[in-house]
Amino acid sequence: MPSARSGPATLELVAGPSRAVLDPARGGRVASWAVGGEQLLVGPPDDTDSSIHWGCFVMAPWPGRLANGRFEWGGRTVQLRRTHGRHAIHGLTWNRTWAVDSVAAAAASLSIELPRDEWPMGGRVRQRVRLSASSLVLEATIEADEAMPAALGWHPWFLRRGNPRLRVDAATYEVTEAMVPTGAAAAVGGSADLRAGPRIGRRRLDLAYLEARSPAVVTWPDLELRIAFEPAPVPLVVYTPPGSFCVEPLTATPNALALASRERRLAGVRELGAGERLGAKVILSVAPASGRA
């Protein structure tokens, strides 16, 4: 239920040993999730208004980097605000305030209007978060007011305690130039091959895996996390900075909006008509580790 702290209200969800806190004012993100007192997500830094590197948030109406913050749509060029060097990153909802539509003991629904001064087509994004004793279910939907391209994803920041293992069942990833995906694919190999569930260790990855099969699996010394996604298979970004790591299920590859129309659709972008919707779901479920960690 709503709880107070310095600054805007947060929402606390509780289901048995599982506890999650949502922060509507900071991107509608899951600010924390703990099971049996064990925290899974990176917590907020002191400057939570400007930091992207914590919690778990929805990326919409596009995920990941968009080269030069620009794409073509309906015969016009849409120029977005550049938020990551020369590029626009992670959509328009991660750093804005979401409205709280409903909240119960273990579930909440939030929504946000896409700002027309940055996204001329308008529209809105809705998300529902449901908690159980051993799972966190995340659902999101983009609704179009008029014809528009759409994609979404989630960006969880996981704690890296105990040198966890990560299994991603994908045989290819998207080639990048200057950290921006190009649309070309390469076979996984070396440190990029996560199919056997290796330890993250010193791997420094920032890759969009293609057609990843559900679920991805994280194994800490005492806990296993299964990241299931619907629909599947999907593009799945793995990012491994020092001290944390991210496993990001997406409905389209990063930079897909910048591709030509046919390639854009092949990369997963949905072209919505007025009143149409794009939805997706992620189910994070935990269980005791089997001993392999």
Model-inferred region functions:
Residues V247-V269:
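A conserved acidic, glycine/proline-rich C-terminal tail/linker
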Residues L13, A20, P24, I112-R160:
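Acidic, contiguous internal or C-terminal segments within carbohydrate-active enzymes
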Residues R19-T77, F245-C246:
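Acidic-aromatic substrate-binding/catalytic surfaces of carbohydrate-active enzymes
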Residues M1-G16:
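Short, Gly/Pro- and small/polar-rich lid/capping loops
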Residues P149, W157-P231:
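Active-site/ligand-binding surface loops and adjacent short beta/alpha elements
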